[in-house]
Amino acid sequence: MDNVKNDNYYIQKIKQDLEFIVVHMKDIELEELSANEILQDSMLFRMIQLSENAKKLTEEYKQERESIPWNALYGLRNRIVHDYGNVDLNVVYETLKKDIPELLEMIK
């Protein structure tokens, strides 16, 4: 990947984060996520990163892909960043296990 930061660059970064989450959460249960602070931090960081990169996509790109819940991605980042100590791990777990794989399929 070159250093040109355009829509393709940001989509590749988003895909990398989504794939990382899907691979590393594959066999993880809620109890393991709850007990593993390093795993929590890693997953939350990836969720923040994919949201940050989604914000950098052009409006044209996002409008062409209206089925992707862009606003939900931005809201996710804001909830994590602004209320980090009070993030509901049940909601995070459901997002990681259900929404993230669906989003990856939508973006592929």
Short names for language-model regions:
Residues M1-K108:
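Solvent-exposed interaction patches of small proteins and small membrane subunits
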